[in-house]
Every structure is written in structure tokens, then in C-alpha cells.
């Protein structure tokens, strides 16, 4: 017995697919992913409108992205690192968690093949978000008590010393 898929449900699923696959760019995107998206498109959803909606962000987030691209440190071997402090979040009128859009945008720089974004939490620890275009970074996350997917992982750094250790390890990989 088949379930009926409503357009709102199809639209939500399609938004999830394009988000999770980076608009079908990520390595784990398969033919099955494309078939599922095609089935959702067949329901009559407005894919361009969904794509535009998923691609938009508030002006203050855009300004943070510009700041992030200007301030990311890039090593000669393609490792990028950025620290977003509580004062930076305040400067852009953002709450903790609203800086997420900056993480993926750093990877759009051609000179970077792996990167880390540290976001200072209220308790002084740092959320660690590791990303790689082709180099797996999840083992680095595991070494620091985190985990995740081969090209997208995370952890928590207890202090600035651990932040520096992660930066050094990422640059040496």
C-alpha cells in the first residue's frame, strides 16, 4: 500500500534533500538521491522557489559571511581556520547558532580543501565544525571527543589551547 504525498510534504522533503546534499554537490549524493528528488518534482512542487528560499539569509548573516571570508586564516596547504567569538556574534546582532551559514561559505574559497570554524559558547568553550571538500576530517573530530561524517564533523574544544591544537592538526593533515 502506497502513501499519498502532499505537495507541502514533498516541498519539505525536497528542501531537506537539497540542503543535505549541498544542492547535489556532495560526494555521497547518489543516483537514488536524484531519483527521489525527481519523484518529489513530479508532485508539482516549485523547485526554483524552494531553492531560492533555502539560499536566502538575513542581512546580518550576510555581513557575518563577508567578515568570515575576510578573516579566515588559510595555510599554504589549503587548511582554513576561523574563530567566531561572542563579541563577533554581538557585533553582527546574532545569537549563538545563527552563524551556521558562514561555515559552508568558507568552503567556497578555491584555496581551501578543509576547514574548521570555532564558535565561542556562553560557557567559554568552543563549538568545533570541521569540513572537508575531499579530505576526510572526521578522525580529527574523534580525537577531540566528537565525530560525524567523513567530510562534515564536529566536536567541542574546552579552551583556546585545544582550539590551537585542532588548528595545528588540521594544517598538518
Labelled PLM ranges:
Residues 14, 19-173:
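Hydrophobic helix-and-loop "lid/oligomerization" segment in the mid-to-C-terminal part
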Amino acid at each position: 500500500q502506497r502513501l499519498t504525498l502532499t505537495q507541502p510534504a514533498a516541498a519539505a522533503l525536497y528542501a531537506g534533500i537539497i540542503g543535505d546534499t549541498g544542492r547535489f554537490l556532495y560526494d555521497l549524493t547518489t543516483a537514488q538521491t536524484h531519483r527521489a528528488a525527481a519523484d518529489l518534482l513530479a508532485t508539482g512542487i516549485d523547485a526554483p522557489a524552494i531553492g531560492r528560499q533555502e539560499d536566502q539569509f538575513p542581512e546580518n548573516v550576510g555581513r557575518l559571511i563577508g567578515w568570515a571570508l575576510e578573516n579566515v586564516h588559510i595555510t599554504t596547504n589549503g587548511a582554513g581556520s576561523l574563530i567566531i567569538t561572542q563579541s563577533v556574534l554581538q557585533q553582527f546582532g546574532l545569537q549563538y547558532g545563527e552563524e551556521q551559514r558562514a561555515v559552508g561559505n568558507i568552503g567556497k574559497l578555491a584555496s581551501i580543501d578543509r576547514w574548521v570554524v570555532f564558535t565561542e559558547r556562553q560557557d567559554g568553550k568552543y563549538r568545533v565544525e570541521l569540513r572537508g571538500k575531499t579530505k576526510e576530517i572526521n578522525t580529527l573530530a574523534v580525537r577531540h571527543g566528537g565525530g560525524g561524517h567523513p567530510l562534515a564533523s564536529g566536536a567541542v574544544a574546552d579552551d583556546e589551547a585545544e582550539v590551537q591544537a585542532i588548528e595545528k592538526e588540521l594544517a598538518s593533515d
